[in-house]
Amino acid sequence: MINYNPLLCLDFYKTCHAEQYPKGLTRMVSYYTPRMSRLADTDKVTMFGLQAFIKEYLIDGFNKYFFERDFEKEILPEYKRVLGATIGTSGVGKERLLKLHNLGFLPLIINAIPEGTRTNIHVPQIEITNTLPSFVWLVNSIETMLSCTMWHTQVSAEVGYRYRQIVNKYADLTCDDDVDR
């Protein structure tokens, strides 16, 4: 679980993207697509970890470390301090962050293939869309947090799948039952 402002878990260069989107843009759709496998000799990825990511980061993490904290006294100074020490504060976007803080929830819809599904590399597994027009910027902002969390759980799930294939193979060779594996 994160234990600090979740907005600091983002790619810092994305902090200024909101100002770069075309005026009048009201909807953003972004996809999480595995681009490669961390395992040799595989061209598939097991979709796994999204439900835990949503609960741990997007619900619990944002509630405890963003929405439930004082914006002016805690969130904004911390955010400015970290950005000021890295890429500068010109992209802080106080008004949009305050608007999100005052809203009290993440205005996002997340659609995905079922967990446990194996897909080919380069096949989108997750779709994220904003539900309120003024939060277009939020969609791509959480991508870093999502991808940093998902790759590890997906590699673990794929390793588990491979172990299961080995166990099934030898169970079929050595067991006297009619169980489909």
Where are these regions (language model features)?
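Ordered alpha/beta subdomains of enzyme catalytic regions
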Residues: M1-R181
